[in-house]
Amino acid sequence: MTKGKIITLEGPDGAGKTSVLEQLVLKLEKDNEQSIVTTREPGGVAISESIRNIILDVNNTEMDFKTELLLYIAARRQHLVEKVLPSLSAGKLVFIDRFIDSSVAYQGEGRGLNKSDIEWLNDFATDGIKPDLTLLFDVPSEIGIARINQNVNREINRLDLEKLEMHQKVRQGYLELAKANPDRIVLIDASKPLDDVVDEAYRVIKERFAH
């Protein structure tokens, strides 16, 4: 049986990774090399989707930063056990829209929480499981925010309402993660047209997992 793998898509808000994932999977499915599962964080399974609704509710303005982090971690654990691990055991290629790096970038760099604590919580929730590959879609914060504001189909969530400074910190957190994990994280310029970004992501995956 083909070994299951985890590929995560990361990036600041407005990077377009969700749109990239849709097109990327279509290209990979045409190759018919491995069964593909796509999922997201927070969410992916019923319990985690319920937690997602709490986290992103625009009315929950009083949410403490540590509460926010712990909710993400709880959603991550349930999602991993209920969906990701069974998919890996079945030899599938699992694409996750956000995973452990989001917590470091958003709650660590963005919120200013202790990154060592976050890394410990990530390891606790995942039993130390890391992605086989992370595609980091990078875009300047101003462009990302402009994209969010222009997307009439996007449902605005609590994190979208943060000021520019928060988005800039998150981006910086991601760039630092890329420097610290060059073997796992591949940086992709997401300011380019969607088709170009999809092609680049496809190329990276094919090169990384060439038989």
UniProtKB/Swiss-Prot annotation:
Pfam families registered for this protein in UniProt: Thymidylate_kin
One Gene Ontology term, aspect cellular component: cytosol
Enzyme class: transferase
Catalysed reactions listed for this entry: dTMP + ATP = dTDP + ADP
A Gene Ontology BP annotation from the UniProt entry: dUDP biosynthetic process
Enzyme Commission number: 2.7.4.9
MF terms in GO: ATP binding; dTMP kinase activity
Organism domain of life: Bacteria
UniProt keyword list: ATP-binding, Kinase, Nucleotide biosynthesis, Nucleotide-binding, Transferase
Annotated ATP binding sites: G11, P12, D13, G14, A15, G16, K17, T18
Alphabetical list of Gene3D superfamilies matching this protein: P-loop containing nucleotide triphosphate hydrolases (3.40.50.300)
Keyword Nucleotide-binding listed: yes
Family designation: Belongs to the thymidylate kinase family.
HAMAP family: Thymidylate_kinase
Function: Phosphorylation of dTMP to form dTDP in both de novo and salvage pathways of dTTP synthesis.
Name of this chain's protein: Thymidylate kinase
Organism: Streptococcus uberis (strain ATCC BAA-854 / 0140J)
Lineage, uppermost ranks: Bacteria, Bacillati, Bacillota, Bacilli, Lactobacillales
Gene for this chain: tmk
